[in-house]
Amino acid sequence: MTEQITPEIVAQHGLKPDEYQRILEHLGRVPTLTELGVFSVMWSEHCSYKSSRVHLKTFPTSGPRVLQGPGENAGVVDLGDGLAAAFKMESHNHPSYIEPYQGAATGVGGILRDVFTMGARPIASLNALRFGDPSHPRTAYLLEGVVAGIGGYGNCMGVPTVGGEVAFHPSYNGNCLVNAFTLGILPADKIFRGTAAGVGNPVMYVGAKTGRDGIHGATMASAEFDASTEEKRPTVQVGDPFMEKLLLEACLELFQTDAVVGIQDMGAAGLTSSSVEMAGRGGNGLDLFLDKVPLREEGMTPYEILLSESQERMLLVAAEGKEELVRSICEKWDLDVAVIGRVTASGRWRAHWRGEVVADLPVDPLTEGAPKYHRPMTPHPALPALHAFDPATLPEPSDLGAALLRLLARPTIASKEWVYRQYDHMVRLVGAVRPGGDAAVVRLAVSHEKHAHKGIALSVGVNGRFCFLDPYLGAMHAVAECARNIACVGGEPIAITDCLNFGNPEKPEIMWQFAECVRGIGDACRAFGTPVVSGNVSLYNETEGQGILPTPTVGMVGLVEPVERTCHSTFRAAGDVVALVGSLQGEVGGSEYLSAEHGKEAGRPPALDLAREKAVQETVRRAVRAGLLSSAHDCSEGGLAVALAESCMMHEVPADGSTPAWIGCAVRIPFPVRKDFVLFGEDASRILVSLPKENAARFVELAQECGAPVIRLGAVGGDRLEIQGALSVPVEELARAWRDGIPAVLRRDAAHAGAAAPA
């Protein structure tokens, strides 16, 4: 008996009444429940980008290095000499809040599959994480679970996690963010795509068996959380990194043959989205025979088989006659493999079950014909009052040294050593710069000896507070800071991926934030010549109507050549000159200092002059490549004082302890405005450098050639951070505060750990 489609069933599938009406018009009949499930996931925000697509089309997506832009599993850029890099960043926010370990682990697994599906071997991962107020009872539970999940999956896969960022803010109390980034290397002339080409070609299932885990995960990721959130735990997928490792090696072996026509990861919406998207890209139809799908649970229905998000699975279109070759390779790696369908010329997507057609749908309405909304937009009503705030009315701290210590202990600024110590960042020895610096640097020599001179710089970041106060400017800052981080290691930025995390797009102020952030990213990318080659949108990050800060995370890739000429982010030698490339404005709007010391999140983000920004970056990049610098460190959260303190604390200490873990400096800073504003303001376009005295004159000449201002501040040495007329604090004391920030969050939670975990 066919189940009747009622308004309640439509609503349970996350579809609006007008969307259901569109389905009726497309089909000319009432859909079956299975067909409704297919429309539900394919028209979800997660799969269709129905609220965001009209804005995303404004991104710059092409350039001389772009081999594959948005629309595939990952973007691909040319690294020269026949080599290419595939990379992407994607969110796993909703699952990670419900079940932090598995949510984060399967997020890593999914992004790894997106990259190796392109034909690339993954060589490095990063992540950008957001958690709630450090004192919130659930924060430590989520932090520990997410970090363990990322480490557990990535370490088993043998892919090092080489960097990332972690920040805390009360807006994430009900919605943590887990944005995972992976990069892989492949021959520039052997890119594989998710296309169902060649009528008559077999469609093959490869990987783990299908179970009931993750059903309607894509729909869950397209809705707000409420009091029933815990009931959604069954929609979180369960990962098996050992199975994924086998799948990775099998796919890379298959790519060495002529058997693969197209291949797609079964990610969000599982078999449904992978098969529909492949048919859409190929301009063809597809017939699936669901009784051929390898199952791990008895009694599964066609609906469950199609919408399951079981992990570690691939859908592959093979060249006709190559089925046995595919089968032999997959069985060698102990993977399930089966022919489950055929490419057709019908333009229709059909699912068969035990001799009956259980779904028969035109492909176009599921892909390009999905709804596209121009949602209403209006600036956030709170902004005029926030912009009118005058920080000059605030009292100046009586003890600037104590204020610096408090900032260093803030979990957003504090050392992330507790986090990256749980990741295997040394596996395969790819890192040229250890975690904790401004950007990660990955050597290509490990996998590609002839490219030993090349390295890749990787950076992720965004300041959500800036993006709330001015979405356009805040998003530009995100791109600029990633590029600045890459300049600090001598890299040339070449392209970005993004992960756009926002609240409910049906609220005009949220849609305005989204559109303005997209505009800001686009304009900044045009200025830096860094096209957007891949990305992800995560909407409905709200709980009980409370949304997150707009968080458009940017992941940037740069080329470091030669890789031997890179740079550390911390001071290296006593007697070195300390200088600031950039200027001192004392802009504290939206700063960590304003929030930490005065409880204010107001004002305007610092002004950003892109010409000045590019001049600062070019100065430092050329200086690193010329071997002039001992260290280079971006000034960001916490401002110049925090950058000085962090530069005093060496991140890499010899195992024998022969070098102390810190070194001091003495500087004299000109104070054009209040001292606390100059010390802790987060002015844009600034890099703190140290260099041998004999290189100082050449460095100043180089800065003048590039058009960047340089302020000589002082010298490295001693065991204190001394800022003349402002503060003098032992570096050991600074290090203690900085290194204890994250462990303090976990200790604070220990007393009420039972309240943090679900019952």
From Swiss-Prot:
The keyword Magnesium applies. ATP binds at Y49, K88, D498, G535. It is found in: Cytoplasm. GO terms for biological process: 'de novo' IMP biosynthetic process. Mg(2+) 1 binds at E90, N536. GO terms for cellular component: cytoplasm. Keywords: ATP-binding, Cytoplasm, Ligase, Magnesium, Metal-binding, Nucleotide-binding, Purine biosynthesis. The keyword Cytoplasm applies. Monomer. Part of the FGAM synthase complex composed of 1 PurL, 1 PurQ and 2 PurS subunits. Part of the phosphoribosylformylglycinamidine synthase complex involved in the purines biosynthetic pathway. Catalyzes the ATP-dependent conversion of formylglycinamide ribonucleotide (FGAR) and glutamine to yield formylglycinamidine ribonucleotide (FGAM) and glutamate. The FGAM synthase complex is composed of three subunits. PurQ produces an ammonia molecule by converting glutamine to glutamate. PurL transfers the ammonia molecule to FGAR to form FGAM in an ATP-dependent manner. NCBIfam families: FGAM_synth_II, PRK01213.1. This is Phosphoribosylformylglycinamidine synthase subunit PurL. It comes from Anaeromyxobacter dehalogenans (strain 2CP-C). The lineage of its organism: Bacteria, Pseudomonadati, Myxococcota, Myxococcia, Myxococcales.
